[in-house]
Regions:
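Aromatic (phenylalanine/tyrosine) cluster motif
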Residues: 7, 12, 19-21
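A cross-taxon signal for low-complexity, glycine/charged-rich
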Residues: 1, 12-14, 25, 30
Length: 219
């Protein structure tokens, strides 16, 4: 995922259409020749979708909201890591499969995975069968366990380091975890409320997300 002018630029497919946000483009209506501008933010594009769309459900109820539970924070990190090189639509469509395959994102259970579990994941067509990403999930689970011992919880570790600039967060995650490049870290922190940008202020969900008291509002 890239970022332009402070907004996330997720690429995703919906009904065969790939949107690249913050691009200035238009399409010609086949019947009446009306020029229609493409959405300028993830929020604008998603709010044009059906309420049952996986993007709409995620955007309206999860994206940019505070997460208190360590397992859910870890699960979000797994999903963001697996999105690398793929569309977010693919990950959202497989999120229930990920949850099941990784034992509800239970950190202790994932940290204890052995070779048999690794092979099980690599053979599971319901998730992303990438060895580097699977290995990163197991490795990172063990790192989170250590952070819990040292700080009380994964959440408290994040809070201890907040606030940081995006570049500072990227450096910290690179030093701490595996497979956490800049865009993965940026999206993880925006999606969990540590960095701003998940919703534009004109978005109908902006104020709703603020009610969850995201960390970026309390610097």
């Amino acid at each position: 995922m890239n970022e332009v002018a402070g907004f996330p630029t997720r690429a995703f497919g919906d009904d065969g259409i790939i949107y690249i946000f913050k691009s200035i483009a238009a399409t010609m209506h086949a019947m009446n020749k009306i020029i229609v501008e493409k959405p300028t933010s993830y929020c604008e594009a998603v709010l044009r979708m059906e309420k049952t769309s996986v993007h709409r459900v995620y955007h309206d109820n999860h994206y940019g909201y505070t997460i208190e539970d360590d397992n859910e924070l870890f699960g979000r990190l797994i999903l963001e890591i697996n999105q690398a090189g793929l569309s977010w639509t693919t990950i959202l469509n497989k999120q229930d499969n990920f949850r099941k395959a990784y034992h509800q994102f239970n950190i202790k259970k994932v940290a204890a995975y052995k070779e048999a579990d690794r092979q099980r994941l690599l053979e599971d067509a319901g998730i992303i069968r990438n060895r580097l990403k699977v290995d990163a999930a197991i490795h990172n689970a063990n790192i989170v366990l250590q952070l819990q011992k040292e700080h009380g919880s994964f959440k408290k570790w994040l809070n201890t380091h907040h606030p940081k600039s995006k570049m500072e967060w990227m450096k910290l995650f690179k030093q701490t975890f595996k497979f956490t490049g800049g865009e993965i870290v940026n999206e993880f922190l925006m999606s969990t409320g540590y960095l701003p940008g998940a919703h534009v202020e004109s978005c109908a969900i902006y104020k709703k997300a603020l009610k969850s008291k995201p960390a970026w509002k309390n610097k």
